[in-house]
Amino acid sequence: MDKIVIASRESRLAMWQAEHIQARLQALYPHLTVEILGMTTQGDQILDKTLSKIGGKGLFVKELEQALMDGRADLAVHSLKDVPMTLPDGFALAAVCEREDPRDAFVSNRYQHLSELPAGSVVGTSSLRREAQLRARFPQLAVKPLRGNVQTRLKKLDDGEFDAIILAAAGLKRLGLAERIQGELAPSESLPAAGQGALGIEIRADRADLSALLAPLNHPDTRACTAAERALAKELGGSCQVPLGAFATLADGTLTLGGLVAHPDGSVVLTASASGPADYADALGRAVAKKLIDAGARPLIAAVLAEPR
C-alpha cells in the first residue's frame, strides 16, 4: 500500500480533523501518500431544518460510507458524536483518537455565563440534548434552533440573532477559536453527547490491512469511555430526535458513566450513573441504560418521538 485516501466532509472543522489524521499518518508512515477526498453530505445541504427533523446525525456519514464502499476512499474521519450507534453491515470503527475537550461551550458577546442572561434572552443550539438541559435549568430563556457550520453559527451570534449560543468546545478549540468561549459547561450543567470531542476513523470491515495501519491512532482510554457512552445510547435507541446525554471518565482502571434522557421542553430530566471496570465498557453502558429505563425512559422516549416537531 503506497496511498491512502481519507473521505471527509468539506466544512472547515471536518477538514481540520481530516488533515489532523493525514498529518499523523504521514508522520507514522513517511512512505505513504495520504490524500483527502472532500465531500458534501445531506446534513451539510439541509440547513433550514433541525437535525431531529431531517433524520439525525447519520446524514453526515452516509455519503462518506458510500465512498468507502465504492473504493473512492480508504477511510473516513468523523466526529464520533455524529456516528450512528450501530454501523451498517460491512463497516467498522478502526480507531477512536484521543479526546479533545468533551464539554459544551457557552459563547456570547455580552454575557460571561448562562446565569447572567436576562429573562427572554435568545440562546441558539442545534441539539435537543442541549435544549432540554437549558430549558430545565433556565426556563426563563428562549431557546431557538441554530444550524450551519461553526463559522455560520458564530456569524449569527455576531449579527445579533442570538444573545448566546452553545457549541461543542472541541470544535472551537480545533479551529483556533478558543477565545470565543466565555466558559465551558461542566458535565453536571450540560451532559455531553456520546462520543463528544473524540474522532472516529471508519473503514470497510474487510480492510484488515487498514485496521493494523490505524492501530497506533487508537487511544485505549478514549475508546473505553466512548464505548460505554455509545452502548448506553444504543440501548436507548439513541438518535437526534430524543435528548440523550452520556459521558464517561476513566480513573485507575474504573469507568464512571453518567446518562441522561429528557423531554425537549426540560419538564422531565432522568439521570443515572454507575461505575465498573474499563474492560466491561459495553456492559456498563447497558447497566446505566437499564437504570434510566427503570426510571421511566422508555415511555418518555416514546412520548417525545410521537410529538410533531
Swiss-Prot record:
Q: Which organism is it from?
A: Chromobacterium violaceum (strain ATCC 12472 / DSM 30191 / JCM 1249 / CCUG 213 / NBRC 12614 / NCIMB 9131 / NCTC 9757 / MK)
Which coenzymes or cofactors are required?
A: dipyrromethane
- Give the cofactor note text: Binds 1 dipyrromethane group covalently.
Family per record: Belongs to the HMBS family.
Subunit info? Monomer.
Q: Which UniProt keywords apply?
A: Porphyrin biosynthesis, Transferase
Q: Does the keyword Transferase apply?
A: yes
One of the GO biological process terms? protoporphyrinogen IX biosynthetic process
Q: So which domain of life are we looking at?
A: Bacteria
Q: What is this protein called?
A: Porphobilinogen deaminase
Pathway per its UniProt entry is:
Porphyrin-containing compound metabolism; protoporphyrin-IX biosynthesis; coproporphyrinogen-III from 5-aminolevulinate: step 2/4
Q: Which GO terms describe its cellular component?
A: cytoplasm
For whether the record's keyword set contains Phosphoprotein, the answer is no
